[in-house]
């Protein structure tokens, strides 16, 4: 059975970097995906699902939730490793509920933990505005992305806390101890 870990955190929390470094350090055992990468890879594959996704993306439309979840589940089942990390998902209560429903209807993937990389808004803002990655790293866009992240957060955390799947990592440190703690946490959860 595949073991899934979801990594969530504010923009600038380092969740993508953390997940990527963990998977790179243990590539024979851990695969890291981001939802956007999965959708782009499916389009590039030329599959029927990829053509469906492309029909939305090429028009600038959002990909429907059921298509996104089918893409994620398909990738999880086909992953080359037993342990899979997805960062930045779920982003809404609707995504969370639908993903939970789909996972509960199958027996190949087990959600083992939802790891929150917790940082203050000040630290997140400082990191995002300091990284200078492009046009989307300005103050107005940061506050919009922060709002999109925080609005559903309490409901998402409550849901996973009730299932005893929510774990917190202090993201306000340098990358090395964060990654080390996350690796250790994943190993600990897997041994339960």
From Swiss-Prot:
Please list the residues that bind ATP. 12-17, 131, 173
Question: Which GO BP annotation is one of this protein's?
Answer: AMP salvage
Binding of AMP: at which residues? 35, 40, 61-63, 88-91, 95, 133, 145
* SUPFAM superfamilies to which the protein is assigned, alphabetical: P-loop containing nucleoside triphosphate hydrolases
User: Where do the record's region annotations for LID lie?
Assistant: 130-136
Per UniProt, which keywords does this protein have?
ATP-binding, Cytoplasm, Kinase, Nucleotide biosynthesis, Nucleotide-binding, Transferase
NMP: region residues: 34-63
Keyword Signal assigned to the entry: answer is no
Known EC number: 2.7.4.3
Q: In which pathway does it act?
A: Purine metabolism; AMP biosynthesis via salvage pathway; AMP from ADP: step 1/1
Major enzyme class: transferase
Which PROSITE patterns does the record associate with it?
ADENYLATE_KINASE
State the GO CC annotations: cytoplasm
Domain of life here?
A: Bacteria
Which InterPro entries does the UniProt record give?
Answer: Adenylat/UMP-CMP_kin, Adenylat_kinase_CS, P-loop_NTPase
Question: Where is it mainly found?
Answer: cytoplasm
Q: What does this protein do?
A: Catalyzes the reversible transfer of the terminal phosphate group between ATP and AMP. Plays an important role in cellular energy homeostasis and in adenine nucleotide metabolism.
**Protein family according to the UniProt entry:** Belongs to the adenylate kinase family.
The protein's name: Adenylate kinase
Q: Which organism is it from?
A: Campylobacter jejuni subsp. jejuni serotype O:2 (strain ATCC 700819 / NCTC 11168)
Species classification? Bacteria, Pseudomonadati, Campylobacterota, Epsilonproteobacteria, Campylobacterales
């Amino acid at each position: 059975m595949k073991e899934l870990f979801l990594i969530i955190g504010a923009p600038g929390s380092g969740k993508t970097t953390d997940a990527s470094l963990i998977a790179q350090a243990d590539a024979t055992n851990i695969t890291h995906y981001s939802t956007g990468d999965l959708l782009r890879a499916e389009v590039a594959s030329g599959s029927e699902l990829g053509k469906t996704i492309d029909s939305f993306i090429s028009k600038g439309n959002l990909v429907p939730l059921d298509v996104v979840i089918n893409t994620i589940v398909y990738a999880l089942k086909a992953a080359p490793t037993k342990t899979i990390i997805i960062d930045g998902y779920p982003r809404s209560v609707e995504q969370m509920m639908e993903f939970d429903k789909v996972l509960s209807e199958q027996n190949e993937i087990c959600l083992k933990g939802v790891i929150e990389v917790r940082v203050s808004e000040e630290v997140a803002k400082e990191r995002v505005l300091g990284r200078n990655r492009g046009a989307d790293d300005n103050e107005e866009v940061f506050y919009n992305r922060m709002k999109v992240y925080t609005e559903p957060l309490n409901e998402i955390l409550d849901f996973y806390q009730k299932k005893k799947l929510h774990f917190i990592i202090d993201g306000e440190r340098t990358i090395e101890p964060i990654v080390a703690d996350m690796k250790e946490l994943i190993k600990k959860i897997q041994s339960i």
